[in-house]
């Protein structure tokens, strides 16, 4: 485990994920999959339920190596969480399932998500002003939300949370984000929908400037300064950091409409998990 020494103990806990109908709106190649942002809520829930002192608003070294599918008939998705507690009190949590080999004799562990939670309190609110979209740099290319969710990120209504127009430039992207609705939990670490929509922004940027349809597979650090809430509006900014090869690397900032920062993410990793089966439409590259 990176930056953690003196591991104290590892425990396994059964976890039941309630498969709310809105989760069926998040899918890949026709199969509903649990979004990374929802998985982070589950990881945080397991952590504080067993170690209440954990700072779940400081998340590090997250990875999402494989999708966790949700069948339409499922009401409860059963998984398990492995929690490793370090000597300093910090935690790492893994969500996994068991898969049997074709022989039906041997089972193996399939990891779906991993994150490390810090022990220390989150950093002080940074004095990071909300930049004007006109100052992104480079020629702007605007995409209506309707076109995004029709052709670029074709998810169902619950996960259509970019509002208005997305502005893209070689130096970044900015969009207004919606806090979402429905049964999603916004108490622990905030609503999952603004961050999910910010990742859609990164996906759109990758389609225009890198020519691939990339999904999030991890991040280096996420700091939650304030919790986003459902039914509220935010502004998301994506900054490309390293796009010379996969995974594409981005940083992200989420503000409210008054310019107050709510979240920052660094080292977001985006990869074409379809292995080229999904391709951007030609129009997204117009004018390049």
Regions found by a protein language model. Name each.
Residues 1-288:
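Acyl-thioester-processing domains in fatty-acid/polyketide/NRPS systems
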